[in-house]
């Protein structure tokens, strides 16, 4: 304003004074407009700058969050890698450490000294590591020995052959006594010899007698020997170990005897246990002069079986059930008291027994009222339980073939005739064969 007044000459007249006033007013208005424009430009620039700074702030915050997440991930990875490094170092140290010798404890002399037998054969009097509990060191225990001092480093768990573990049925048999027909007397004898000692041992203690150690079931094929053994295991809730006699016959010397020994050891460990040896005649045939190495190996396996049954060591709640259809060829040593204390014959069922078996197998069948089970039992003389089951199945197949909703008397008669023809034909005949 002062500059404007200095640049203007002094007014002489009123007109000049008015012109001067108007000029000054216009100049001031122009300056105010320029100032307002500059102000708006400055505000716009400031707003843009603030917006840019806010965007940058958000970007930096996002980068900080990402950096923190990366930091946490890296720390986690670091911990995992450190753990793997420690594990690898431990494995490396174990690989660099000398191997240990496998041995067996023979005798415990005192709290600090133990007699062991190494895998090479010699026996040594050694000491045990302080980390080994002295109460766990017992004769027969497997252990590891230091190569230099032969001191006991640690105890190993007992080892059983995988084939022996395969003999144990994980699931308890589902068969029960009601699934067995025509063997009422035999069931009672087996229950007295096997089930009663496991469930009520105090009865034998009261009377003062030892319970039977084993039961031998013999009779023609298909009469229910295996079924009876499964029913006993089901009723006693005992571990059931099933082995076929031929499985105990091995190729190499001593393998069969080792399997028998481990079978008894595992049975004692899992007591109460029922060992069922099916087709025991495969390993228990009468001993004769062995002409081949295979015959001698079978005899060695039989002797180990006899030793296990003799009870040199108490077997606890372990019962043995043997089954065979050739009792005439069994070794006499197997049949003496103290091994198989009860020898029970499982004969072919009579007419009453066949009727009982038919009732068991027809419980779930849909039959017409014309079916007379006593009549069918009379027509199946000489048939065993397996034959009667096959007859029931064949009768059902005839009903399905003829699209009938239920089995008729004629279906059973046709099934009886078919089963009879199946047994009369040779195995190579193609006519009259059974469905299954």
From Swiss-Prot:
Keyword Iron: no
Parts forming coiled coils: 15-97
Pfam families in the record: AAA, AAA_lid_3, Prot_ATP_ID_OB_C
Keyword Coiled coil: yes
Residue numbers spanned by region Docks into pockets in the proteasome alpha-ring to cause gate opening: 434-436
Entry keywords, A to Z: ATP-binding, Chaperone, Coiled coil, Cytoplasm, Nucleotide-binding, Proteasome
Localisation: Cytoplasm
Gene Ontology CC terms: cytoplasm; proteasome-activating nucleotidase complex
GO-annotated biological processes: proteasomal protein catabolic process; protein unfolding
Main location: cytoplasm
GO MF term list: ATP binding; ATP hydrolysis activity
Binding site for ATP: 222-227, 361
SMART domains linked to this entry: AAA (SM00382)
Physiological role: ATPase which is responsible for recognizing, binding, unfolding and translocation of substrate proteins into the archaeal 20S proteasome core particle. Is essential for opening the gate of the 20S proteasome via an interaction with its C-terminus, thereby allowing substrate entry and access to the site of proteolysis. Thus, the C-termini of the proteasomal ATPase function like a 'key in a lock' to induce gate opening and therefore regulate proteolysis.
Subunit comment: Homohexamer. The hexameric complex has a two-ring architecture resembling a top hat that caps the 20S proteasome core at one or both ends. Upon ATP-binding, the C-terminus of PAN interacts with the alpha-rings of the proteasome core by binding to the intersubunit pockets.
Domains as described in the record: Consists of three main regions, an N-terminal coiled-coil domain that may assist in substrate recognition, an interdomain involved in PAN hexamerization, and a C-terminal ATPase domain of the AAA type.
Family membership: Belongs to the AAA ATPase family.
NCBIfam families: PRK03992.1, proteasome-activating nucleotidase
Protein name: Proteasome-activating nucleotidase
Organism this protein belongs to: Methanoregula boonei (strain DSM 21154 / JCM 14090 / 6A8)
Gene name for this UniProt entry: pan
């Amino acid at each position: 304003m002062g500059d404007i007044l200095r640049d203007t000459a002094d007014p002489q007249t009123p007109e000049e004074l008015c012109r001067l006033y108007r000029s000054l007013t216009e100049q001031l208005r122009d300056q105010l407009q320029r100032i307002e424009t500059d102000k708006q430009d400055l505000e716009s620039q400031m707003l843009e700058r603030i917006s840019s700074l806010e965007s940058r702030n958000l970007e930096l915050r996002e980068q900080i969050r990402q950096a923190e997440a990366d930091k946490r991930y890296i720390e986690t990875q670091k911990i995992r890698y450190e753990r793997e490094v420690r594990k690898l170092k431990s494995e490396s140290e174990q690989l660099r450490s000398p191997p240990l010798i496998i041995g067996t404890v023979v005798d415990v002399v005192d709290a600090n000294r133990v007699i062991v037998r190494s895998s090479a054969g010699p026996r040594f009097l050694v000491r045990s590591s302080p980390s080994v509990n002295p109460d766990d060191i017992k004769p027969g225990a497997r252990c590891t020995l230091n190569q230099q001092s032969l001191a006991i480093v640690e105890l190993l768990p007992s080892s059983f052959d995988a084939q022996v573990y395969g003999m144990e049925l994980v699931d308890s048999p589902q068969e029960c006594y009601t699934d067995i027909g025509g063997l009422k007397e035999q069931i009672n004898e087996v229950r007295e010899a096997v089930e009663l000692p496991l469930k009520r041992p105090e009865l034998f203690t009261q009377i003062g007698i030892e319970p039977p150690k084993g039961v031998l079931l013999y009779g023609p094929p298909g009469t229910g020997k295996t079924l009876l053994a499964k029913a006993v295991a089901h009723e006693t809730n005992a571990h059931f170990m099933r082995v076929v006699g031929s499985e105990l016959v091995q190729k190499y010397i001593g393998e069969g005897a080792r399997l028998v020994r481990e079978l008894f050891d595992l049975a004692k460990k899992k007591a109460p246990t029922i060992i069922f040896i099916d087709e025991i005649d495969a390993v228990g045939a009468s001993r004769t002069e062995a002409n081949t190495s295979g015959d001698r190996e079978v005899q060695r396996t039989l002797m180990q079986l006899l030793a296990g049954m003799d009870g040199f060591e108490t077997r606890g709640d372990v019962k043995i059930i043997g089954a065979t259809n050739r009792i005439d060829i069994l070794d006499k040593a197997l049949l003496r008291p103290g091994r198989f204390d009860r020898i029970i014959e499982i004969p072919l069922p009579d007419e009453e027994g066949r009727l009982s078996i038919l009732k068991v197998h027809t419980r779930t069948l849909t039959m017409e009222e014309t079916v007379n089970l006593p009549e069918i039992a009379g027509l199946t003389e000489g048939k065993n339980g397996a034959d009667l089951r096959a007859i029931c199945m064949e009768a059902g197949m005839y009903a399905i073939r003829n699209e009938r909703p239920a089995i008729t008397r004629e279906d059973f008669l046709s099934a009886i005739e078919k089963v009879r023809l199946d047994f009369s034909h040779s195995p190579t005949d193609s006519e009259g064969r059974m469905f299954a």
